[in-house]
Amino acid sequence: MANSVLTATYEGYIRDTADALRIFEACLTGSLTHTARRPHDRERSTLITSGNVFVYEEGSSGIKRWTDGVNWSPSRILGNFLVYREMNQPFSPGEKKRASKKPKKQAGVAKAYDHRPQATRFSSMPNDPAGVCAGGDGGAGDEDRDLVGSLTDSYDFKPNSLIKKTISITHNGIPHHLVSYYTVDDVRSGRLVRPSDHEFFGRVQPRMELMSGQNFRVPLEDGGDEESRGVMSHGQQVMPYPCNDYQIFQHAYGNAAAPRTGQFTYGPPQNGTYAPVSVPATHAIQNGTYAPVSVPATPALQNGTYLPVPAPQNGSYYNLHQNVHQNVHQNPAYPWYHAQLQ
């Protein structure tokens, strides 16, 4: 075990809780492998790099604390994750890990307001009971808060510094941990592929325990991240209410969407492209692509399942969020929806 070759569990970018849950589920089912040990000193230069994701469970690995030899800043909260950013120098022994004070802005110079929506609303949350350091204020690099949280200019960071992002879950009473590494440039350039953007994970559906049996800081339905909660950027509710975490995940990442391709290095899917589960009889794969879906003209809510969506026009894929919202919003047969708007 100690001399075994260590490889990453996955190579890509874990953007949100839904991405992480897909990775955890794939590890639990054996599609991906858990990390059996921490990297040795001689392995760190090749393993602790942008894009590598490691998942380990405390029971069999015996890992109580993940170490990688990088000089990290104090942690910051980012939704259900903790993020760290690589620094030029470590803190001296006994030195307090205080964020540096930013210079005051000169009066009379107004900074243009950035109207772009931030990818997360939780990048500057205060300390949590576990002792996570409070976030800093804005400053240079505010446009990257979706990637670094509040770690924008509060410490002496390396140029294009490595970022560590972690999240933990419990399965059958055993903690499982995910540790991912990336740089802002690699994410922005699209070099790192999210699990939800890879066809391999189109058939990976997290089990109920992973969705609703966790003590997440931000529950999925309360805004753990935008995609997992099934709410579009302009705030429209697009699914029946009420619903649970599992329904939210199915709606946001369910099998209705055709799988997409991307970089994946550990076991590509077998037998070609996977068809969605529970596909209507008229749905077929032609030449490796999905044919338009024929669905009933009048959507209906039955046994808590999701509303069917109208067939696509002009041969394009249907817009799951937009069409469901329009059907429900315009159809008086759904009083529960209109009651939510009052």
Swiss-Prot record:
Keywords of the record: Nucleus, Transcription, Transcription regulation, Virulence
One protein family per Pfam: Gti1_Pac2
Compartments where found: Nucleus
Region named Disordered: 91-113
Result of knocking out the encoding gene: Results in greatly reduced pathogenicity and loss of trichothecene toxin accumulation in infected wheat plants. Exhibits normal vegetative growth but shows defects in asexual and sexual spore development.
Main location: nucleus
The keyword Transferase belongs to this UniProt entry's keyword annotation: no
GO molecular function annotations of the record: DNA binding
Gene Ontology CC: one annotated term: nucleus
Family classification: Belongs to the MIT1/WOR1 family.
Reported function: Global transcriptional regulator of pathogenicity. Regulates many genes during growth in putrescine medium and during infection. Involved in the developmental processes of conidium formation and sexual reproduction and modulates a morphological change that accompanies mycotoxin production.
Protein name: Global transcription regulator FGP1
Biological source species: Gibberella zeae (strain ATCC MYA-4620 / CBS 123657 / FGSC 9075 / NRRL 31084 / PH-1)
Gene name linked to the record: FGP1
